[in-house]
Amino acid sequence: MIELSLKNKKGKINVKSSEVKNILESRPDFEYVQDISATINQERIMVYDCQLSRDIFNLDDIEEIKEEMGQNIDDFYFDVLFEDIRAYLKDATDEIEEEIQEKYILDNVRCYFDIYNIDETFTDFKFVFLISFKDIKIASLTNLSKLIGKRQLSGASKFYS
């Protein structure tokens, strides 16, 4: 857990990564959330290792479509499904960003995610979720999320312990 001392419109506030973790865990679409903020050396950025709920995108629906079509679905369909997942997480990211801005009365909050693992059944989605409490370019958040995602995939994640 880390704690940030920030200034908002009402004065000084402290934001604990454990409090933000509770916000993420309260979402029904996030099955698991682990605070890994202390593992990075980035000022005013919190990071979480997350797993999307298995109920959000289910292969049972895909199996039904396959049966209806009477043929195998090609890789294009899975590319479309992956883009649907990214769009879903982007919407969730926007909602979380807005919730944090409202809760802490902060304007300078940016959130970003990077999917680092999807199993072959398309039911297990793991991603890193970053929250920046400073003025930062989206390209910097993108690069940082990709680096952390690679680290999690290579064994730092609780999911692979």
Language model regions located:
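N-terminal interaction modules that seed assembly of large macromolecular complexes
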Residues: 17-70
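A structural detector for beta-sheet-dominated domains
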Residues: 7, 49-51, 116, 130
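Amphipathic protein-protein interaction modules
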Residues: 79-137
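N-terminal presequence-like segments and adjacent domain-start helices
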Residues: 1-12
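Short, cationic low-complexity segments
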Residues: 67-87, 150-161
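Short, non-transmembrane alpha-helical segments in secretory-pathway proteins
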Residues: 14-24, 93-101
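Acidic, proline/glycine-rich low-complexity IDRs
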Residues: 124-161
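Short, solvent-exposed secondary-structure capping/transition elements
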Residues: 55-62, 105, 109, 141
